[in-house]
Each structure stands twice: as structure tokens, then as C-alpha cells.
Amino acid sequence: MRFLMILLCSLLWTAQGYASIGNVILHEGNGEIERTTGESQITVKDLDVFSYDVVKTGNGKTVIEFVDETRVDVTQHSKLIIDEFVYDPNTKTGALSLKASLGTVRYASGQIAKNSKQNVKISTPTATIAVRGTDFALSLIHI
């Protein structure tokens, strides 16, 4: 009985520790999502996305919608790292930090940017963008 209780508690902790923060709403071509466990999953529509995932596209495009309605389009030959995502659906506040390290990414603000503007950051290898509730695209070119 004791073993069963420990197992049940560990399963509940794991489920809460790895809650989905959004999902892939559109995917074309090839791409993958690297998990913190080191495993990679082929990107498909409706695939769950988690904090600390790394989204990579080859000859394709991946569109992610987070639970706060933030939308990020990762175009071909791009890489996006989800550094932080915290969201309280009751207050519609939280924090979002993304790192675009290659290619082109389009960002459209959701509830976090509308209600916690100071807590949204998009960074690149050479700059950080403080988002103030907007829609923009950025391209990174390696020379």
C-alpha cells in the first residue's frame, strides 16, 4: 500500500511538473522539437509544447499557440528556444522568455504581453527585445 501511495504521488508530481504550455497548431515540411530529456520529436499538428523546448525547422514551418494565446511562427531553417513560460489564467498574467537563435520568427502577443508587458522578452544572440503588446517578425542571418 505504501508503495502504491509513493507511486501515485510521484505520478502527480510529474504531471504537474511538465504541464503543456501550448501546442503546434500548424506544421508544414520537416521539423523537430528537442525536449529537456534529450529526446527529439518530429513536429506534427497538435503536438504539446513545454517550457525549455527547442523548436527547430528544416525545410518547413511550425506555428505554436501558447495557452495565453501568444502565437509564434517559426519559419524554415530556424531555431527557437522557449526559455520561460509562466501563466496564471485567472489573472491573465505571467512571464514569457523566448530566444531566437537562427532564421526567422514571427511573434504575436497574447494575454501575458497585454497584462504583464514587462515580463515578456525575446532575445537573439546579440540583442533583447522588450515586447509591449505587438506583432513582429525578426530574422537572424549568420555572416
Regions found by a protein language model. Name each.
Residues 18-59, 63-141:
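Flexible, surface-exposed loop/linker segments and immediately adjacent secondary-structure boundaries
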Residues 5-13:
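Bacterial N-terminal signal peptides
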